[in-house]
């Protein structure tokens, strides 16, 4: 009898160790959800990576000198090869650069349609990063009283105009109040940030 009891206990323990159909189904569903979520995340990150790589290549192509000037109000002494930029994209009108956040250093384009560069990079590739572009109503030579330049506030990666959020800090503003516009005619325009605020994309400008 003792032997029979031991055999029954062993059989029960073996049954407990196995996967029942319900548990196996739940596990497979969870695994599928995980794989799908990982795939979606990877697909979401690809544009940030490819777009970032593209703009790094453009910087390597176009910036021929990158020395910082002396004095707070002196523009960085670096030169942009606008001939190469024009060959890559004839819509080029300028180069925009901040000392800090230093990541904001991009070519500026202009199109007859403000929607064109919302999802198209400087090199005309479809990408959610888009490009930094001037309002179609402005003059290319920045002779207007107000010139509007647009760029995306990317939630991941910090590309394009995302880092402008740093100006929410008064200390950051005081430390880095200037930015610079370089144009194909060889001029460098120095601007001082006097106001920064967050508005909806539907706000009138």
Positions of PLM-derived features:
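Solvent-exposed, non-transmembrane regions of membrane-associated and secreted proteins
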Residues: 31-205
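N-terminal Sec-pathway targeting helices
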Residues: 13-31
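N-terminal Lys/Arg-rich, disordered targeting/topogenic segments
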Residues: 1-19
């Amino acid at each position: 009898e003792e032997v029979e009891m031991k055999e029954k206990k062993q059989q029960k323990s073996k049954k407990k160790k196995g996967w029942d159909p319900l548990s196996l189904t739940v596990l497979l569903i969870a695994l599928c959800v995980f794989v799908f979520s990982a795939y979606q995340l990877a697909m979401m990150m690809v544009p940030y990576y490819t777009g970032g790589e593209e703009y790094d290549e453009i910087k390597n192509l176009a910036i021929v000198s990158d020395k910082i000037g002396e004095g707070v109000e002196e523009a960085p002494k670096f030169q942009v090869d606008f001939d190469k930029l024009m060959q890559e994209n004839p819509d080029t009108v300028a180069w925009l650069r901040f000392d800090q956040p230093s990541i904001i250093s991009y070519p500026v384009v202009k199109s007859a349609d403000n929607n064109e560069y919302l999802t198209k990079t400087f090199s005309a590739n479809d990408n959610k990063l888009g490009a930094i572009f001037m309002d179609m109503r402005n003059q290319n030579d920045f002779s207007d009283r107000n010139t509007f330049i647009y760029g995306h506030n990317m939630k991941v990666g910090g590309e394009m105009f995302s880092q402008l959020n740093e100006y929410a800090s008064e200390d950051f503003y005081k430390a880095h109040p200037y930015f610079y516009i370089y144009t194909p005619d060889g001029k460098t325009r120095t601007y001082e940030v006097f106001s920064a605020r967050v508005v909806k994309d539907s706000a009138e400008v």
